[in-house]
Amino acid sequence: MDNISDLPLRPARFVEHRLITSILDGTYPPGSVLPGERTLAGLIGVTRPTLRESLHRLAGQGWFTICQGKPTKINSFWENGGMGLLSILSKYSDFLPDDFVIHLLEVRSTLLPPIARLAAANEPEALLGILEQAKIIEDDAMIFTRFDWELQISMARYSHNPVYVLIFNDFLSMYEMLGALYFQMEEARRSSRSFYLEMYKNIRSGGKGIERIVDATMKKSIDLWKNLKGNDL
């Protein structure tokens, strides 16, 4: 079951939900075409203007290609979609491939070390102020999830590169879902607490090794996630 199907939805939002679900579950696979507008509106149970509005919105996100006088074609969203799809896909976690989270963590592992280096160089005192809270953070999965996100988005801001902030903002919905699972592991909380304190000490000493510390921890988090999913099998 996806993460939003039990919520009451407005007509346009309901249409979007039905269409996205139908793409992800293979009813309308990439490369296929949608039924005609009249037929599709009847199948979903909405008016044609409502359907048309939703189709254009989803087309703008990369799900469809709409050509006047031709059937609406379903795109390969992995190839045509943008970063904004991350927040949408987080609501349909049951449809994500098994290796999707690993790919996401690998992207973070590439981005975060240089971001941390810039943040430590630009705003060391502000970063220390956040990291100092790690000394008293409660041993709770949701609290760790919120703290870890606050640290990451703050580092993106302190990098003084607004593009990093935009990228990480698109990670938020996905991160909230995954972090709650990840930090259920005691080893993950213990590893992250050690990471925060190691970062704190390093920045206090000048921050020259911060990129190496973050890189090692990001790679370890991938291994921990693999262990978590392996135990679920």
State where each predicted segment sits.
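Hydrophobic, amphipathic alpha-helical faces that serve as interaction scaffolds
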Residues: 107-123, 147-188, 221-226
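Short loop-to-helix capping motifs
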Residues: 36-37, 160-162, 205-206
